[in-house]
Amino acid sequence: MSQLNLIPFFCVIIVLSVEDFPLYTIPEKIGPWTPIDLIHLSCPNNLQSEDEGCGTSSVFSYVELKTGYLTHQKVSGFTCTGVVNEAVTYTNFVGYVTTTFKRKHFKPTALACRDAYHWKISGDPRYEESLHTPYPDNSWLRTVTTTKESLVIISPSIVEMDVYSRTLHSPMFPTGTCSRFYPSSPSCATNHDYTLWLPDDPNLSLACDIFVTSTGKKSMNGSRMCGFTDERGYYRTIKGACKLTLCGKPGLRLFDGTWISFPRPEVTTRCLPNQLVNIHNNRIDEVEHLIVEDLIRKREECLDTLETVLMSKSISFRRLSHFRKLVPGYGKAYTILNGSLMETNVHYLKVDNWSEILPSKGCLKINNQCVAHYKGVFFNGIIKGPDGHILIPEMQSSLLKQHMDLLKAAVFPLKHPLIEPGSLFNKDGDADEFVDVHMPDVHKLVSDVDLGLPDWSLYALIGATIIAFFILICLIRICCKKGGRRNSPTNRPDLPIGLSTTPQPKSKVISSWESYKGTSNV
């Protein structure tokens, strides 16, 4: 708004007259030419002039749309997804505990989602704690399942509100719209069965924050209001206006597509369904200074050209291009015929692509037909070159259009994961992938030996086990000794030297080494 106040006669043209700054303007049709003198040349006026017979009178207040207004008003909100964290443990015979973590979904409530959102934006540690998996419980030779419910908040989640129907629009809604948003149902269902969308402001009643109060001066003809001059000095006519309500606020849609509201308007005609308000989007705010600079430069070029023409008392085809009206609307077109300067009143239309007026070589298309030239000369500096091509001076100076194209290409909107058209969700209730990036990682764990006993009992058990182990070793050793004695042969008493046992009749027994020696000497 501040820039509009600084440069009222240039920026208002763009904001209020056209949706985007046009690439070029071309007359809707060419009327009869009238010869003029050089002193009749004038730089185009892109502002509407006041109606004849109407004069400025009293100051009054009116309501208009804010700068940056969008037909789809942005509504900031968040999504809330219900997730059940499960910890399943199994303890085997020797005490090894296997823990497996799982995630499933549940349907949340709007009240619980609002509380979780407040925790998150306020930095309450309870929100982060609620996302962690539960501490698993276990029991010997049993499977134990421990569950914990969490609410995953993803923000921001921006939806759009249509200012005409007051409905919310977003690809994340099942039908693309959420039309039953009231205080009694302060949430919208999404294309994910376990996710709700809620606005940041719990008191949102679809009231539009798109209006601003301004001060202007009425232009009256007796008791009839012809129009008014707004606070930026731009005159607006009431001719062709119709009644249109935006966000429940009655007002008027003016002929140029702008919207205003003031008490007791005299207009009674209602707008048709296709008569909507011009879009004034953020892109225009971003390039506003570029547009203003370009318009100022073109205005200065036109004034410099006019000064040069009047000083030199001569004009060329190229210089006529500076006197073309830059935006759609009524103006004048100029040409040179038989050495005389000519003008005609025309209505300019915007051109967004050169192919609209140059469909083929040598053809300048106006009113769906190729217009004739006079010795290679058309109007407004447009000529036909020696090779048959149409030469338009502005085709070489489309810097402003390049600025807008660059800005359009540099927009990277933040997308909510549910907006992705190719998103597929699990039908069995298991948690979907988009919640994983907003929750701590989970994995399968195998614990050390754990019998589920307290520390002192565990130490007592370990001590008893060690004692029992030593006792067992002692018992094994004793048993081994007793078994070895039973299996060993009986020891005989030693005999005196020189005596031998009585020989057995069937075998010769040598009882000692001495006896063996004596026997061997015989």
UniProtKB/Swiss-Prot annotation:
Topology within the bilayer: Single-pass type I membrane protein
Keyword set includes tRNA processing: no
Compartmental location: Virion membrane
Reported function: Attaches the virus to host cellular receptor, inducing endocytosis of the virion. In the endosome, the acidic pH induces conformational changes in the glycoprotein trimer, which trigger fusion between virus and cell membrane.
Subunit and interaction comment: Homotrimer. Interacts with matrix protein.
Family that this chain belongs to: Belongs to the lyssavirus glycoprotein family.
Protein name: Glycoprotein
Gene: G
